Amino acid sequence: MRMFKITACVPSQTRIRTQRELQNTYFTKLVPYENWFREQQRIQKMGGKIVKVELFTGKPGVNTGLA
């Protein structure tokens, strides 16, 4: 199964007292080859940035610490 292992950074807004603080959330996930374009659009619509993309073959959850 062809997959992409992507690392992305997405801003998440949290309210602290009365001011807004912008925090970035980094995450790594496996995305199937067929869903890559949709996932890329989703991250960019959220104002995120894709940091790294690797081609990954094998089963989901193996060698990524997601198991």
From Swiss-Prot:
The keyword ATP-binding does not apply. Keywords: Antenna complex, Membrane, Photosynthesis, Phycobilisome, Thylakoid. One of its GO terms (biological process) is photosynthesis. Residues 1-56 form the CpcD-like domain. Gene3D superfamilies: Allophycocyanin linker chain (domain). This is Phycobilisome 7.8 kDa linker polypeptide, allophycocyanin-associated, core. Rod linker protein, associated with allophycocyanin. Linker polypeptides determine the state of aggregation and the location of the disk-shaped phycobiliprotein units within the phycobilisome and modulate their spectroscopic properties in order to mediate a directed and optimal energy transfer. Belongs to the phycobilisome linker protein family. It is found in: Cellular thylakoid membrane. One of its GO terms (cellular component) is phycobilisome. It holds the Pfam family CpcD. It is a peripheral membrane protein.
